[in-house]
Regions:
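C-terminal active-site "lid" helix and adjoining low-complexity regulatory extension at the edge
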Residues: 156-183, 187-192, 201-262
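Active-site nucleotide/adenylate-binding loops and adjacent lid/helix of ATP-dependent enzymes
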Residues: 1-100
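A short, terminal or domain-edge coil/loop segment
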Residues: 54-66, 128-144, 246-262
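A long amphipathic alpha-helix within ATP-dependent nucleotide-binding catalytic cores
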Residues: 73-74, 81-94, 107, 112-115, ...
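Protein kinase-like catalytic core scaffold
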Residues: 36, 112-114, 208
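Short, flexible loop/turn elements at secondary-structure junctions
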Residues: 8, 40-42, 81-83, 104-106, ...
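Short secondary-structure transition/capping segments
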Residues: 45-56, 122-133, 157-164, 239-250
Length: 262
């Protein structure tokens, strides 16, 4: 995960060690950083509220909220160190943290994943979300980009519009670490059936998980990027299980999780 400088949970400020701190202490911690990244941690999506700020930013803390250059964050937010992507990701677009969207799900006795997408910034923006103007491409399990990039409006690009990098066949170095990391993380929390992970690779080659989204995740991104369904050849089996689960009383469904029907 990116290194936390300050976070706020239920209006309570904490440092990187999860110790409760005062408003003065929080401002002191931020004053030591040349730049940092701020984002809400609850009920947020599509890069909304994500802000990159510098040391001279106007910051005020008050009653479980923070004002940053006029942007208001309440109750739940995090302030993190900046991440620098590895060379192969930076070469495509250097101004954003380009991230992999990997949707994992538990099916019977293993962690499976839907088709993988790489989200990429453009136009000088430092966020890569499709709803914020970014583009996305299909990527295979070896870290190779499969085809052209698209926008959410199905505008297609054979090359990145800013850097000119050709997409199809481009290989992302050390991608295997990302896939292994999110799989291992999901194994640690089997109570959650499906997780939308946002992850990247830093300049030192480490897999970095930025977010684990456990609700409101959509399958439109991998479907649009790859042109295939999210469950592939497993789709018939999944639909049969869903039909079966509709007949089971809610309080009895725990016995039939992850594709089990008997």
């Amino acid at each position: 995960m990116p290194q936390t400088i300050v976070d706020c949970a239920n209006g309570v400020l904490r440092d990187s060690e999860k110790h409760i701190i005062t408003k003065t202490m929080a401002k002191e911690l931020l004053s030591r950083k040349q730049s940092f990244f701020v984002k809400p941690t609850v009920d947020s999506c599509s890069g909304q509220g994500c802000v990159k700020a510098d040391q001279g930013a106007k910051i005020e803390f008050s009653n479980g909220a923070m004002s940053l250059n006029g942007n208001i964050y309440t109750q739940y937010f995090v302030i993190q160190e900046l991440i620098e992507c590895n060379e192969s990701l930076q070469r495509i677009y250097p101004y954003a943290v380009n991230t992999f969207r990997i949707i994992t799900y538990i099916w019977k006795d293993s962690i499976q994943h839907m088709p993988i997408s790489l989200r990429i910034g453009r136009g000088g923006k430092y966020v890569d979300n499709a709803h914020a103007g970014g583009i996305f491409v299909a990527i295979d399990e070896n870290g190779v980009i499969c085809n052209h990039a698209s926008t959410e409006f199905n505008e297609n690009y054979e090359r990145h519009p800013d850097t000119g990098v050709k997409f199809e066949g481009y290989k992302i170095a050390q991608f295997d670490k990302v896939l292994a990391t999110v799989t291992r993380f999901h194994e640690a929390i089997p109570q959650i059936g499906c997780i939308n992970w946002d992850a990247t690779i830093d300049k030192d080659g480490n897999a970095i998980v930025l977010e684990a989204n456990t609700s409101d995740g959509g399958v439109w991104l991998p479907q649009m990027a790859h042109g295939v369904g999210p469950f592939g050849e497993r789709i018939t089996e999944v639909l049969q299980w869903l039909r079966f689960m509709k007949k089971i009383k809610p309080h009895e469904r725990g016995r039939f999780t992850a594709g089990r029907m008997g």
